[in-house]
Amino acid sequence: MAALRQPQVAELLAEARRAFREEFGAEPELAVSAPGRVNLIGEHTDYNQGLVLPMALELMTVLVGSPRKDGLVSLLTTSEGADEPQRLQFPLPTAQRSLEPGTPRWANYVKGVIQYYPAAPLPGFSAVVVSSVPLGGGLSSSASLEVATYTFLQQLCPDSGTIAARAQVCQQAEHSFAGMPCGIMDQFISLMGQKGHALLIDCRSLETSLVPLSDPKLAVLITNSNVRHSLASSEYPVRRRQCEEVARALGKESLREVQLEELEAARDLVSKEGFRRARHVVGEIRRTAQAAAALRRGDYRAFGRLMVESHRSLRDDYEVSCPELDQLVEAALAVPGVYGSRMTGGGFGGCTVTLLEASAAPHAMRHIQEHYGGTATFYLSQAADGAKVLCL
């Protein structure tokens, strides 16, 4: 059992250029890339103004294209799993006519970024999207596409915004055009990732801190359950609303301002379910701070213990895990050399992330597959750089 080979940026770029030539009859003039991400710890805390600790992945979206003079946007994707149609054309938004979300769903992420892009005037353009980020796997294929789109638009019409402002435009696109009230972590790490580092993000102040993650004896294993339960999209807004209700009941702007002791003392002010949801978030923010400190001092065992605590809290208090994810985590934890494992992403399917000794990775993948009822896909990734302009 081996990890799925990840196409390198040169391969994705070659595929995108080939598709562009076939579709538009010319070479593209511009090319950009933006990575997916895995969140090592800090789950469902970003929209509660908490702490998160993601790293950018070597899985990425590549977008190539050229400006055009007719005010139209013409798009093609070759991404596996993207809904039909894989090509479409639409006019740029105007003061009188905004873009609207529709079908195909994959194009809504592009449309949203175009709609909220702050600089003008944008020309029309033709573009091809190629991605190695699995769709629906909890590795931020959506943020990767949003950030790639934003980075491409910058080449057509430069902006003057901060990185935080760029992340917020991409986040707004996902809120309004994909109907997902996500936090800002995914867009931030796709923009700001740095090779050999995880990124501790404070989602209240938007301050960031690089945390070294380049020990060659250490590996990060991502395991895709290849299941996606329908609860994923419907339950996410429910969890967010429950957290906001508890914060209001405690007279706080967000759960970031709540300590566990305060929450315990106010147990009677909130529903039992609301209390459990908030207990996860408040505890997870604390765990994330502790995990970043553990990683800085090279204490992988402490980091792993916090990952396991995080998973159990997501399973029992936040109730966003599922039997498949639990099975993957338990199988990983049975392998010598594994420090910790947890579900990552929104939940109800998608991926787990496991921190382990690099030498243990082959055995871990075999053991997990043997003890998993479904078919898992494995990715071994180093911490990668954020969005880039590529040379053609």
UniProtKB/Swiss-Prot annotation:
SUPFAM superfamilies: GHMP Kinase, C-terminal domain, Ribosomal protein S5 domain 2-like
Enzyme Commission number, as recorded: 2.7.1.6
Swiss-Prot/TrEMBL catalytic activity: alpha-D-galactose + ATP = alpha-D-galactose 1-phosphate + ADP + H(+)
Transmembrane spans: none
Keywords annotated in UniProt: ATP-binding, Carbohydrate metabolism, Cataract, Disease variant, Galactose metabolism, Kinase, Nucleotide-binding, Phosphoprotein, Transferase
MF terms in GO: ATP binding; galactokinase activity; galactose binding
Residues that coordinate or bind alpha-D-galactose: R37, E43, H44, D46, D186, Y236
InterPro entries, A to Z: Galactokinase, Galactokinase_CS, GalKase_N, GHMP_kinase_C_dom, GHMP_kinase_C_sf, GHMP_kinase_N_dom, GHMP_knse_ATP-bd_CS, Mevalonate/galactokinase
Kinase found in the keyword field: yes
Annotated metabolic or biological route of this protein: Carbohydrate metabolism; galactose metabolism
Positions of ATP binding: G136, G138, S140, S141
Pfam families named among the record's database cross-references: GalKase_gal_bdg, GHMP_kinases_C, GHMP_kinases_N
Entry-annotated residues carrying Phosphoserine: S230
Family, similarity comment: Belongs to the GHMP kinase family. GalK subfamily.
Protein's recorded name: Galactokinase
Organism the protein comes from: Homo sapiens
Top-level taxonomy: Eukaryota, Metazoa, Chordata, Craniata, Vertebrata
Gene from which the chain derives: GALK1
